């Protein structure tokens, strides 16, 4: 399918993985830019 989570999409259990340029933020459960 190639569907991925965009900026601020819900991520985690049962959700699509975040798009490559984002990571799933455990604090918010949303796709966000990687934090250093």
From Swiss-Prot:
Negative results: has no significant effects on Kv1.2/KCNA2, Kv1.3/KCNA3, Kv1.5/KCNA5, Kv3.2/KCNC2, Cav1.2/CACNA1C, Cav2.2/CACNA1B, Nav1.5/SCN5A, Nav1.7/SCN9A or Nav1.8/SCN10A channels. The presence of a 'disulfide through disulfide knot' structurally defines this protein as a knottin. It comes from Chilobrachys guangxiensis (Chinese earth tiger tarantula). Disulfide bonds join 4-19, 11-24, 18-31. This is Kappa-theraphotoxin-Pg1a. GO terms for cellular component: extracellular region. Belongs to the neurotoxin 10 (Hwtx-1) family. 44 (Jztx-4) subfamily. It comes from the Eukaryota. Gating modifier of Kv2.1/KCNB1 (IC(50)=5.1 nM), Kv2.2/KCNB2 and Kv4.3/KCND3 channels (IC(50)=39 nM). Acts by shifting the channel activation to more depolarized potentials by stabilizing the resting conformation of the voltage sensor. It completely inhibits opening of the Kv2.1/KCNB1 channel at negative membrane voltages and dramatically shifts channel activation to positive voltages. May act by partitioning into lipid membranes and then by binding the voltage sensor paddle of the channel from a place within the membrane. Expressed by the venom gland. Keywords: Disulfide bond, Ion channel impairing toxin, Knottin, Neurotoxin, Potassium channel impairing toxin, Secreted, Toxin, Voltage-gated potassium channel impairing toxin. Its main location: secreted. Pfam families: Toxin_12 (PF07740). GO terms for molecular function: ion channel inhibitor activity; potassium channel regulator activity; toxin activity. It is found in: Secreted.
């Amino acid at each position: 399918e190639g569907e991925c989570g965009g900026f601020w999409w819900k991520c985690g259990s049962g959700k699509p993985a975040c798009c490559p340029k984002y990571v799933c933020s455990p604090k918010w459960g949303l796709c966000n830019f990687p934090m250093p």
